[in-house]
């Protein structure tokens, strides 16, 4: 069921109250009905659970907080204004008052709720793939489109390379060269043997990153290898023997800190990242090697398929654009057509 929409007047009042709470924090002011609460302070959301959020204060302490009903959305990584409570019923010890403007936000489409944010304020999106459950260039390309759309730098990480034979390693290196040639950084690592982990740690240092990718590619194992030894280990699931598909270990996005500097948001894995909320033009621009050819096709409404005079297809045929990327571009549109067909019923 769709949610009731606020009127324009209600939206203005909600926004005015939100701005007032941000301004009160800056002035150190408190409202009369907030006296049971402590002073407003800055915090960061480390995880979100329904109508509650875990908020970390400046000293690294974590408080489970209620959310003001006027907050439009709250996700892991959000910078917030919150107040600690004097009592702690049911483990709740504060309330989130307001959310600061986001520097960046990663989203995904939802059939019922439109576009939903996943996490905020990251400056690097780590696209984790692996040989098991399968090496999917399609999912890598989908996440690259998402990265280009939100203008956040991607890092492609191929895990479980300890499973490679010399012959299969050569084949995988050739596939990863597709991305290196167009300017993307690719790291090949193993959380089991430690191969490639030092350059990976260096790439995460001093940045706020988010782990994305398929279920079962080893994001939790990588996180365990990156966190200090004294940190509580993250639960790890294996690939299902029955389906051959990855199983979800992480169920909600959570923010972690590295002792060597930097922060990481671990997000739940997906089977396929939907992009049907994006316009066709934005998807085409999300394939960065297409950009110099966009607008140069013979026909303005070129679909970059079998259309005569298509500049992008010409670049594929000449070897300038990889046919694997071109095929995945069309797979995205095929899946969008299937989603739209289901939504029409």
From Swiss-Prot:
Stretches with biased composition (Basic and acidic residues): 23-34
Enzyme class, broadest EC rank: hydrolase
Binding-site residues, GTP: 159-162, 213-221
GO molecular function per UniProt: GTP binding; GTPase activity; metal ion binding; rRNA binding
UniProt xrefs under InterPro entries: G_CP_dom (IPR030378), NA-bd_OB-fold (IPR012340), P-loop_NTPase (IPR027417), Ribosome_biogen_GTPase_RsgA (IPR004881), RsgA_GTPase_dom (IPR010914)
Coiled coil: none
Superkingdom, natural source: Bacteria
Protein name as catalogued: Small ribosomal subunit biogenesis GTPase RsgA
Species per Swiss-Prot/TrEMBL record: Sodalis glossinidius (strain morsitans)
Originating gene: rsgA
